[in-house]
Amino acid sequence: MIEPSEDSFETMMELKNPSSKQMESSEGSSNTVEETPGSSGAQAGAQAGAQAEAQAETQVEAQAEAQAEAQVEAQVEAQAGSDSGPAQEEKEPPSGPLKEMQELPTNLLQEVEEPSSGPHQEMQELPTDLLQEVEEPSSGPHQEMQELPTDLLREVEEPSSGPYQEMQELPTDLLREVEEPSSGPYQEMQELPTDLLREVEEPSSGPYQEMQELPTDLLREVEEPSSGPYQEMQELPTDLLREVEEPSSDPCEASSNDLPQDMEESSDDGSNQESSDGSNHELSNGSNHESSFGSNPESSDVSNLESSGGSNQESSDGSQKESSYDSNPELSDNSNQELSDNSNQESSDSSNQSSDISNQEGSEPLSEASDYSMDETINSSETQSDQDDTDLGDDEEEEEEEGGEEEGQPKNSPEEVVATMGNVISLFLRMQDLKEQQRVAERLMMQAINEGRLPSLRPFSGDRRDYHEFVVLCQMTMQNYPSMLYNDELRVKFVIRHLTDLALEWANDLVEQNSPVINNFSAFLEAMSEKFEYRQTLRVAEDAMFNIRQGNRCAADYINEFRGLIPTLGWPDEVLQAHLCQGLNEEIRHYLFRIPQPNSLDNLIVLVLQLEEKLAERRALLRLPPESRPRSVAWMDAPAPEKWRVSSWLPNEFHPDIDRDHLFLLLLVRVDPYHSVAVRALVDSGAEGNYMDERFAQEHYVELYEKPYPQIIQGVDGIPIGNEPVWLCTEPLVCVHQKHYEYIEFDILPSPNFSIVLGMKWLRTHAPEVDWMRGRCTFHSPYCLRNCFTPPPPCIALETYSISLLPGLPHTYSDLADVFNPREADDETSDQPSSDGSDDLSESEPSELQQAGDSDQSGVFYESGARETLEPVSARMQEKARQQEKAREQEEYWILYDMLTDRQDYTQMVPELFDQLHGAAWFTKLELLGIKESEMRHTVTHTEDTWRASFGFGLHQMRCYRPFTMNSYSDEGNNIVHFILKDILGLFVICHGREVLVYSMSQEEHSQHVRQVLVRFRYHNIYCSLDKTQFHRQTAEILGFNISPKGVKLNKNLMNLIVGCPVPGSRRCLQSVIDLVYPYRHFVENFAVIAAPLVRQLLSSEPYYWGEEEQEALESLKRAFRKSPVLYHPKPQNPFYLETDITGSFLSASLVQTDDETGKKSTCAFYSRPLSTMEVEYPRVEMRILPIRAAFMVWCRYLENTEEPIMILLNTEDLASLNNDRLTVLLPGHWVFFFSHFNFGVMEMPAEGDTQALFRRCWNQRGFRARFLRPLLLMSIRANLRYFDRSSETEDKEDDEEEEEEDGEEEEGEEEEDGEEEEGEEEEDGEEEEEEEEDDEEEEGEEEEDGEEEEGEEEEDGEEEEGEEEEDGEEEEGEEEGEEEEEGEEEEEEEEDEEEEEEEEEEEEEEEEEEEEEEEEEEEEEEDEEEEDEEEEDEEVPSMVRELLAAIPMDHILNGLLAHFSVAQIRAVVLNFFRGLLYWKSLLGVAAVLVMLRARQPLSPVPAPNLEVARPQHRHTLRLILDSTLIASSGMATAIAQLLSQMPPLVGANTLPARELAELFLGPRCWHRNALHSQPPRGMRFTPGFWLTLCEFFGVRVNPEDDVFPDPYQHRYLELHVVGDEDVVLREALQDDLQRYRQCGLHDGLQDTSQDAQDNDVQEDLFGDQEAVTFRPRNLLDPEVLDFLNNRLLYTLGTDGRLTLLSRDQVAQALTRFLAMASRMALPSPAREQARLEELSDSDDELD
């Protein structure tokens, strides 16, 4: 329904009661209602008088009568002439006859900027040049417009709704009171009575009447009007509408012209192009600033008016255009206030109708209510620019097609969610600005009411503190004089006339630039707001930045929150670095300041994350004994000076000498053109000038100047401060605080507590706004806006743009060019100043760098400085090496023999060798000249000794690795370089022969490390090859290893050497092959198993023979090396996993962790060896524990005293055996003490295709979230570096694949097939790695739509579940088959008849054949599963955006939003939320409710009196212990507890006390008691077996009280606690408990018998000796229960005739249906008092 114009109603009320005019005007102004032209929203000023009304009353009445008659006649004619309602205005009726507009002359229409709001028939015949100038429609009648002269119309920019001639005749004092008239004639509306005005909502004539009668849903479905002007409007060319500045008032005109013919049939009648394109420009250009006050009667007012969803009327011109902003949160305050005074129910319906129509098109289906106009609002400038260059019809068509596609896929991508969330937050904060503006308006209005007039409009100088008051007064003034300020240009000129100083300069610049905002008042206000308004968004961001601290959080969470504030603040990089460091923990800052300061914020973030990782590793390593700790820990703990230019950074604790009530600023003082110092500056209003501490100036080499005359320091009161005058000062230094730049000249004085003091001189200059409560200063003065918010020109460091004398040499080392060019080194090169400001080191006076780099060296050694001194020493060492050559060759065989035959487990070398490389991210490889290249002899001793020497290990550290004789390195060049770099070798340098590798954690630190090495080489006349040197890389190769930040891999050269080994023709050649590959055995899984035939041949005393077995072993070994993975650096702070196995007479183990970036399994090391003769005879249980013990022994450095439990991954069979045998109880006596040093548990090994199983477990562990977010940040910051790594790895893969293809061509027969299989597997590995790279790229933001991702994830989940079910089924079938074989073997031993034996053998053969067939089927299934896994991996697309969404502080956002909602709104939201929870509740919960309500069955009492006599006294009730980790959903535990608490009484047990319930469950006499019933109960018979099955299946166990059923001590079971997963068991037994178990004979009895026999014996003892029942642990189910689960619950018959294992969810659904049927058959019964259930208490004391 269309409402009457509000100003028409007020005008009539003025005629009745003139005195009410002033009251309503003042109310309208205070309510800040905005009005549109013709919609009567603007209120008249409060300054009008009663005399002006009386003078105008008679004249207005006469004119209104004539206009009323003309209006009625025009409406009758229009009604008679209209056929059916064309698509006209829905908001206002036509105000003039339809034929009038057609007769207007062209020259007159060209001057009209606002076309009329009449029907479309008039618009069709308008010429092209008229349409190009159309801006806004006028609402006056066309008949009156024709009578106006042309020269008068040319001056009219926005005519009023009444006739312009009569408005000119009104006196000035009357014009001040005239509100903006409505769309009808002003005279008519004044004379219309109240009852007539009420009927104006639905005019009686014209097509408008028919349109009004259509319902909203019908209007939306109108495809094309049946006749008249609408069809003709479609014929207008599209290019005419491109120049329309403001869309037409008729919504149908604006939309129909833009739509092509085919689009009109499917488009809505009420939607238009302006709702998505045209109107956004006005809102984004500042219409929100005036939205609260109604000063702008144009479309921006309409936008705010309609945005309330029900304010006033919708009959204004152009209102449809702005209705897309009806849900804008910024305007809710204005609309709420508007609703309180000016709205009614009909207007609310009308505005809602228009908003629905306008928002139906060009929006996303998910956000139908209010959210889908926000993106258009934020991106309005882009939309407006696109509209000028694009065909509107095509855009409409594309938008509608996209909308149709999105309806099918309503899910938004994570990027859209993040963008929408950002829009919501920005709009919410923008709404706070409008609230502040509204509060200012209310204050000014109250002041105006008290004083009787508006406050005077003071000029605005640019002070941001006066902005809101100035804008509000301007809008109120323009509201009171609408006829004088009736267009945008006049309003802008009015505002500019009241600007002074900085604000006037800004406006004059816009005028001189001929900016388009001068002609658009909304855009002008927006630009002014951007310049002079201190917005709430910036205020909130600054408060958060000053208060943000890391606290107990991980650095990744802190950095995520910090980075979220950066775009809003826009502070310079150096200021952000200072604030980031200020909020860090003291421990991180301590080590951070010892590293050179990074040159950017991103590098600082990377460095902080690396430091946190190093500190976590350090804390883990400190748990080891001092002799086992790596050297990196000692280096971190060594004292070192701070290298940052940081001063007075107070820690979080209170300083004893500083009063915390002082006001401090974090100030960055640029002490030289290239460096700034962060310092806390004291703001002291008691000091007169600005002062700097004398020590601070000396420490940072600040240039000081002498004053012309000494100056005495005085306070504000004039009292001298100090005894000595000030005679030194600094030059003006650049000081930066946030975005505030200034030049300050400091006076120098001794100030021990404060480095910088800012006094009254600084306060007077900047006039900051000081918040003493929060200790903050903000700068709003015009002086700061003019001078302090523009950064000074940067100082260009010449070293950054310098060109090195040698091409390829980085400029950082340009002063050391002579090290790389020994022949052309001259004086010019040597005299070149160094880049860090230090002098050349060859001069007599050493520089700072030389002192810092060489201070710890021996002075005698460096005094010699000549290489000749070292040559004799090297010659003697070389001679000694020659003498030992023969003896070494003789010993090599015996050393290798000892290593191959040794069966002891020693500490492994390879993982510990690379411990010092942990955290290294930058590498530089130097190639030396003049050094003889060391010849790498591929023997075990020489290779491993070379590794130790290259990494800087000493002889005392070498003894812990191998028991063979140590040999010194024999290379002369090695000894020279090692002697030069001996103190830094292994800290950040690795040296081997000509190759020197420098590695560092950060780029800034790396440059200093390289300089330190180059300085030493220059001092000793050792030169480097520039062509072969690699600077600042992410990967490096040395000693046959490819080193990266993640780990170590064998390089291509070594791989080619191993793969190219020929077939050995003698035992000596075979020894050379084994010498070559044996040192790298830790890179190959099951190395001892693969190389066993070669080792046997080498150690054999028989003649040398090379057969097929040896050839196959050699080829398998080559393939294994080609597939050798990257060995990741072990991280002691992360959880470890052990994979152990026994293969024949060999044991193997692998140390595993999870990759933080991909979540996949990452191997740290492999280990394998043959079993000794004694170990082969170990019992079966000890044999399973043997590889675990070996792994603990080999990797004890990482596994001892770990914080997280070491999870031992076992297969299903071993896991069940070790769980039942009690791993820690069955340990041999000499192993118990050894295992007590380790914190370990056991869990089932995940499926091969499930690469994320370990990652999912780690996600639930404490502290893993921090470890997970840290690499995500590193990925997002260092994308370019990772791209370089991927490119190099891709090249390696391609080379490897080519080599494999060549090898595959050479192989024949089965070997050829094996080679092809391996190649296929490697190709799959390559594809997986490429997929990982693609995943990384997608995590950086280049991912596809979320709909496809989620579909892929659902498919993967389904396939994984099917795969798990099949595997479980196969495992159980395998167990059953194994049991059958054991039974068959026992029968063969017992029976003596040969015939029976033959029959059994035949049966065994048949079984074997069946097993072979089943194995073939299993292999086929495994192949299918592998294919499915490959497809899953192809579809798996991890999203970094989704993971980062978890780090968004939603609690702060939610609290901020809830603070602005009423209690009723919050209550409604909460009720809707819980209604949704109830709707999506688990099906089992619904079934539980049904059982509780309806399954109460009364049972008849037991008639047998003898039971009552024999009944014991009442005891404590039983307790059900719920294990929530075994229940599928989170709410299922509660549902089961309620279900069991209200379950029907057991048949025959309703009169039994709770004491006998346990015996009733498991006792043999329960069926006898059931037979005592005289009559069977009605309904389902819930047998005890059923409830026992239900309890056991859902992890519920019945545990009696201690006093009821005493547990025999000698048969007590070791309690096992389940954590995280059903198959994860942790050990919690003390040493004395283990010894007590052993003393009781439990170990001896269990070790000699099988597990089943042990369990049966224990149960027979329990039931045979006593009537009381001791319950077994949850793992040992009753045989009846197992039979029930196997036959009825867990398996179902599939389509192929095979039994398929059901998942737990399927079983729960089946039980749900069963319980639902049972509840329908059972009758309710009252709950018993004695039998009740209690939930498990959280305390462990009650459980014991």
From Swiss-Prot:
Compositionally biased region (Polar residues): 31-40, 269-318
Disruption phenotype: Mice suffer from late fetal or neonatal lethality. Mice overexpressing Rtl1 show notable overgrowth and morphological abnormalities of the placenta.
Biased composition (Acidic residues): 385-407, 837-846, 1291-1437
Key word Transmembrane helix present: yes
GO biological process: angiogenesis; embryonic placenta development; gene expression; labyrinthine layer development; placenta development; skeletal muscle satellite cell proliferation; skeletal muscle tissue development
Keywords of this entry: Developmental protein, Membrane, Transmembrane, Transmembrane helix
Cited SUPFAM superfamilies: Acid proteases, DNA/RNA polymerases
UniProt biased composition (Low complexity): 19-30, 41-80, 332-361
Pfam families referenced in this protein's UniProt entry, alphabetically: DUF4939, RT_RNaseH_2
Ranges annotated as spanning the membrane: 1473-1493, 1520-1540
Superkingdom per UniProt: Eukaryota
Gene Ontology CC entries for this record: membrane; Z disc
Inducing factors: Down-regulated during time-course of induced adipogenesis in 3T3L1 cells; Lipid accumulation is unchanged during adipocyte differentiation when Rtl1 is overexpressed.
Tissue specificity: Expressed in placenta and in various tissues in late-fetal stage.
Intracellular or extracellular location(s): Membrane
Region (Disordered): 1-416, 823-859, 1287-1439
Functional description taken from the UniProt entry: Plays an essential role in capillaries endothelial cells for the maintenance of feto-maternal interface and for development of the placenta.
General remark: Rtl1 is one of at least 11 genes called Mar or Mart related to long terminal repeat retrotransposons. They do not correspond to functional retrotransposons, but rather to neofunctionalized retrotransposons genes. Rtl1 is an imprinted gene located in a cluster of imprinted genes on distal chromosome 12. It is expressed from the paternal chromosome and has an antisense transcript expressed from the maternal chromosome containing 2 microRNAs, mir-136 and mir-127, with full complementarity to Rtl1; mir-136 and mir-127 are processed from an antisense transcript, Rtl1as, and may function as small interfering RNAs to silence Rtl1.
Protein name in the entry: Retrotransposon-like protein 1
